[in-house]
């Protein structure tokens, strides 16, 4: 619509909630796909093709204008059309330019009138990252407290309801009888303890027995009689009786000692007794109120791609355990000092006091790094930011069993600094982020190991080497590329590494046919297509066997023949990543999403897709894989959408649907019905080894 009369009445507030990237999701269903922000209030909800929460808000509040956060379209519900015009002050144009600046993190926005509209949550000048992180941490505490309060109320209501049922009454009667039995046992133990204390006090306060008095008198008599003997015999008797005289105080029994000589039992008797508990004397261990791993990650502004990948990596047992043990604080400090020496920062020697010990203090050289930061420029250097350190910090919080929600602000800040392609609040691809993240983590570990081999402690060097080995091998596999010449039947083999398998859909799904979109596709069919034999177009292959008799100085041309090519798996990784290429080209430059459902099973046998010509065939158990995680893309296109993940929780033995801050337990049948984008399968042999290491 060229002219909408409702836009002229628009009065946009300076501090609208749409300027906060953390609000770019539906407040009802938490999706980031097709999110519309009301221009009359701070409400943000999903469009009519998702759950119609924005339309429902219009029906309740009668606010006609809404703006799509990602595409920046303005829609009027009263006119039932898109709006093309603007108001007199140009608020819509200014709002679009401000949102574009927030997404790209470029805040140089100017207007003809000089008016600016800034985002208080995304502008680095008004709100530093540390202050924003503190605000998010307070919100996380409040969310966790509300979660605990809600769970306690639900548990109390359930217990009240259960107490009214027949089964509940029976259980309460059994618990009451058990408590009475425990109370009787406790009273009996208390009576025995009291009787024992009384006997001890009576024995301590009673005079020594007659037998002991007679024995002491006899000992004194024997020690006095030798004094009347001659001098020679007296010396000999004294030598024999001296040990007896020294050892006489030592054989005293507790009955002979006075209360002044036994302060410990008296103090122990005066020690106040703890109040008895209803369940007995054994202390009850307090369980974590949140299951480890069931911790949501706050959406900081179209960061669902990062949250889904972090949830998957944290639920991979081998990957998680490595970063839980890894601590690169000391290594990073040494790395920073090495970098500063390379840059020629000689001013550091002048700033540091002469008597300062670099290794003194509990921080182990924190003063050195603090002084080094004083002479560095204000812009943070990417060499001092570590994704490994952020993973080591984030994973323990997610698996502590204490937090229901965590804001990964530090992780996002590190990603912005180290991977500039993901800087800003624009929507990104989860597969690309996973590849870039693993590549940066691998390079960090390699740089840490090579630059500081002698200064890092031996145990840390071994741990860094182990983690690097796990990161390099957990997703690493090998492909066998085999080309067969059709003229001489000679086969040329090439080994190529891979970290994931990008599987294409069959040809029938690359058309706009509605019948093909309704028929589901199987994962085994896509794997068979990946490993099928394909014919090279025309005579384009220069066979080595056909041209081996030709010399380099020969003037004859190289013989080109027809050939066939096939890809097969030569070495399987511990964790198999299957990337489903859900796009097709429509026209020259337009990509569409293939929204067909892919049928995948909980167990996967990779033996049909591995090469069988190699002499060292692995054990049949190595071909079996178990489903560990699924990343899903919700939406019709690649320019917009929402990412969630299904992850298998090894601690609880159940599946969890991770939708940013909202996590819910689900069944495996629901997982298999998901529209998968990335599949993670863990080798069953590797799972058994991880379980044995835990035991």
Swiss-Prot record:
A zinc finger (UBP-type) spans 2-99. Signal peptide: none annotated. The active site is at 304 (nucleophile), 642 (proton acceptor). Its EC number is 3.4.19.12. Zn(2+) 3 binds at residues 38, 41, 57, 63. It catalyses: Thiol-dependent hydrolysis of ester, thioester, amide, peptide and isopeptide bonds formed by the C-terminal Gly of ubiquitin (a 76-residue protein attached to proteins as an intracellular targeting signal). Keywords: Cell cycle, Cell division, Hydrolase, Metal-binding, Mitosis, Nucleus, Protease, Thiol protease, Ubl conjugation pathway, Zinc, Zinc-finger. One of its GO terms (molecular function) is cysteine-type deubiquitinase activity. It comes from the Eukaryota. Pfam families: UCH, zf-UBP. One of its GO terms (biological process) is cranial skeletal system development. Residues 198-294 are annotated as: Disordered. Zn(2+) 2 binds at residues 26, 29, 46, 53. GO terms for cellular component: cytoplasm; nucleus. It is found in: Nucleus. Gene3D superfamilies: Cysteine proteinases (3.90.70.10), Zinc/RING finger domain, C3HC4 (zinc finger) (3.30.40.10). Its main location: nucleus. Zn(2+) 1 binds at residues 4, 6, 76, 79. Belongs to the peptidase C19 family. USP44 subfamily. Deubiquitinase that plays a key role in the spindle assembly checkpoint by preventing premature anaphase onset. Acts by specifically mediating deubiquitination of cdc20, a negative regulator of the anaphase promoting complex/cyclosome (APC/C). This is Ubiquitin carboxyl-terminal hydrolase 44. It comes from Danio rerio. The gene is usp44.
């Amino acid at each position: 619509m060229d002219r909408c009369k409702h836009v002229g009445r628009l009065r946009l507030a300076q501090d609208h909630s749409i300027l906060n990237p953390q609000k770019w999701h539906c407040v009802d269903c938490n999706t980031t796909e097709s999110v519309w922000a009301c221009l009359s209030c701070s409400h943000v909800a999903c469009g009519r093709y998702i759950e119609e929460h924005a339309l429902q808000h219009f029906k309740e509040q009668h606010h006609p204008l809404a703006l799509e956060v990602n595409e920046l379209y303005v829609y009027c519900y009263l006119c039932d059309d898109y709006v093309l015009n603007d108001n007199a002050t140009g608020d819509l144009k200014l709002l679009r330019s401000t949102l574009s600046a927030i997404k790209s993190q470029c805040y140089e926005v100017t207007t003809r009138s000089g008016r600016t509209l800034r985002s208080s949550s995304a502008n680095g000048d008004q709100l530093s990252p540390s202050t924003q992180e503190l605000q998010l941490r307070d919100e996380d505490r409040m969310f966790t407290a509300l979660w605990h309060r809600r769970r306690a109320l639900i548990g109390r209501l359930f217990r009240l309801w259960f107490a009214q049922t027949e089964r509940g009454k029976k259980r309460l009667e059994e618990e009451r009888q058990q408590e009475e039995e425990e109370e009787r046992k406790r009273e009996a133990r208390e009576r025995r303890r009291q009787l024992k204390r009384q006997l001890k006090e009576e024995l301590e306060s009673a005079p020594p027995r007659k037998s002991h008095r007679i024995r002491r008198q006899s000992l004194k008599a024997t020690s006095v009689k030798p004094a009347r003997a001659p001098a020679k015999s007296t010396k000999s008797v004294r030598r024999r009786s001296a040990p007896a005289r020294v050892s006489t105080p030592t054989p005293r029994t507790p009955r002979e000692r006075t209360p002044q000589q036994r302060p410990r039992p008296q103090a122990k008797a005066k020690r106040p007794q703890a109040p008895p508990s209803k369940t007995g004397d054994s202390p009850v261990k307090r369980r974590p109120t949140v299951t480890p791993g069931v911790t949501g990650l706050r959406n900081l502004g179209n960061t669902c791609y990062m949250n889904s990948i972090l949830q998957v990596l944290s639920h991979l047992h081998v990957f998680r355990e490595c970063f839980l043990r890894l601590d690169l604080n000391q290594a990073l400090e040494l790395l920073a000092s090495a970098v500063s020496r390379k840059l020629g920062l000689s001013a550091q020697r002048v700033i540091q006091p002469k008597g300062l010990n670099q290794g003194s203090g509990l921080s182990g050289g924190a003063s050195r790094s603090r002084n080094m930061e004083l002479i560095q420029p204000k812009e943070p250097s990417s060499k001092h930011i570590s994704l490994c350190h952020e993973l080591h910090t984030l994973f323990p919080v997610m698996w502590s069993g204490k937090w229901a929600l965590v804001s990964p602000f530090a992780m996002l800040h590190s990603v912005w600094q180290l991977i500039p392609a993901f800087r800003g609040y624009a929507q990104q691809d989860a597969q690309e982020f996973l590849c870039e993240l693993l590549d940066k983590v691998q390079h960090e570990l390699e740089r840490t190991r090579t630059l500081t081999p002698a200064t890092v402690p031996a145990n840390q060097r071994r741990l860094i080497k182990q983690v690097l080995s796990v990161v390099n091998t957990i997703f690493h596999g090998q492909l066998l590329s085999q080309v067969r010449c059709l003229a001489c039947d000679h086969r040329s083999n090439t080994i190529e590494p891979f970290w994931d398998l990008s599987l294409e859909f069959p040809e029938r799904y690359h058309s706009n046919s509605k019948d093909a979109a309704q028929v589901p596709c199987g994962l085994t069919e896509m794997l068979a297509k990946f490993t099928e034999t394909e014919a090279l177009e025309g005579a384009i292959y220069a066979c080595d066997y056909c041209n081996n008799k030709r010399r380099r100085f020969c003037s004859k041309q190289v013989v080109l023949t027809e050939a066939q090519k096939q890809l097969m798996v030569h070495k399987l990784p511990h964790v198999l990543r299957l990337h489903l290429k859900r796009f097709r080209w429509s026209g020259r430059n337009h990509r569409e999403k293939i929204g067909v459902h892919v049928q995948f099973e909980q167990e996967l046998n990779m033996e049909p897709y591995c090469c069988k010509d190699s002499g060292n065939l692995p054990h049949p158990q190595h071909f079996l894989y178990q489903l560990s995680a699924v990343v899903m893309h919700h939406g019709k296109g690649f320019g917009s959408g929402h990412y969630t993940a299904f992850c298998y929780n090894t601690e609880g033995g159940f599946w969890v649907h991770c939708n940013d801050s909202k996590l819910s337990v689900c069944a495996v049948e629901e997982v298999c019905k998901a529209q998968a984008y990335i599949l993670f399968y863990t080798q069953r042999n590797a799972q058994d080894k991880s379980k044995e290491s835990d035991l």
